[in-house]
Regions:
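Exported/periplasmic ABC-transporter solute-binding proteins
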Residues: 2-163, 168-322
Length: 322
């Protein structure tokens, strides 16, 4: 048999499988929209958009009162933190620090910059090893606290604002609300199909986050001791994901994603402020306890908790502590 004939036969045999895969993608897989897939990643925070001292920056621009400002030559703390809080602490930096203290090479902050953005896991390592002086993050995970303890570092956590932990689905999903227990049952593997919680007959693809990330730490706390063991593959059906409200609404802002009500309450700013939404948590300015007497660190903390600092928190779409 000629080689060309063999190739043709192979292609004809493969064609039904190719058509089937295309059908599945168009009518099933594509509509799932992994909340942590490529679309979410492409819409992640772009550092350049929130740089201090930049006329086109999207940060909240407030000039700190004289008592809170640093001058060139002063001892100044290095600020770092979680990705979702970067626009907030970059605005703090812009308000307090002199021009020339932030070094950005077009892709990342340089080693000598007083402003850094290493994400949650990297920021906790930085505060422990001394390469950052104040970090802005959600509550640390048990592993992060143990890492600090193992290295002889005790941390001080100062609440500076409120945020909501939210659950999200593709906008085509008919489910608009889940209860706390339903979410826990889904992520512990007890509930496997959307039909069981008022949706259509489709497997639930429950997405998880990397261990050590702020959202995964929040999810572990939310599960209240139950192990996270989703029943289905992440490619099995309509997805359910979780994150913090600001990241989903303020950064991703995709029409394909919808936040769910929890116990019948939508995570609006008002419902977060009055604590009717079930999962409201603090985020913190965190520093080493041994640095408690450092005037530069206490100056930053005082500004963050001042009326101007809390204005930055509020206008950055978070909820102020005061």
């Amino acid at each position: 048999m000629k080689r060309s004939t063999c190739v043709l036969i192979c292609l004809l045999c493969a064609l039904p499988f190719i058509l089937f895969d295309a059908f599945v993608y168009l009518h099933f897989t594509r509509r799932l929209m992994n909340p942590f897939g490529k679309e979410m990643q492409e819409k992640s925070i772009v550092l350049q958009d929130f740089l201090p001292f930049d006329e086109g920056s999207r940060i909240v621009k407030v000039r700190a009162a004289e008592e809170y400002r640093f001058a060139s030559g002063d001892v100044m703390p290095v600020l770092d933190g979680a990705t979702a809080l970067y626009p907030v602490y970059s605005a703090f930096f812009n308000a307090m620090y002199p021009v020339g203290t932030c070094s950005f090479n077009g892709a990342d902050f340089e080693e000598g910059s007083f402003l850094q953005k290493r994400n949650t896991g990297g920021a906790f390592k930085a505060i422990v090893n001394g390469t950052a002086d104040i970090i802005f993050c959600a509550s640390p995970s048990q592993e992060q606290l143990e890492y600090a303890a193992q290295n002889g570092v005790e941390l001080v956590l100062v609440p500076i604002g409120f945020e909501a932990f939210v659950f999200l689905v593709n906008d085509s999903n008919p489910v608009v609300s889940l209860t706390v227990e339903e979410v826990r049952d889904i992520y512990s593997g007890k509930v496997k199909n959307w039909l069981e919680v008022g949706g259509d007959n489709s497997p639930i693809s429950a997405i998880t986050r990397p261990r050590g990330s702020g959202s995964q730490t929040a999810m572990i706390s939310f599960m209240n001791g139950q192990p996270i063991k989703p029943a289905n593959s992440i490619y099995a059906g309509r997805t359910l994901g979780y994150s913090f409200r600001y990241y989903v609404d303020g950064i991703v802002a995709s029409k394909n994603i919808r936040l769910l009500e929890l116990n019948g309450v939508y995570p609006s700013k008002e419902n977060i402020r009055n604590h009717t939404y079930p999962i409201v948590s603090n985020f913190y300015a965190i520093y080493r306890k041994t640095d408690s007497e450092r005037e530069d660190i206490q100056k930053v903390i005082a500004f963050v908790l001042s009326e101007q600092g809390q204005q930055i928190v509020e206008q950055s779409s978070y909820i102020s502590i005061n």
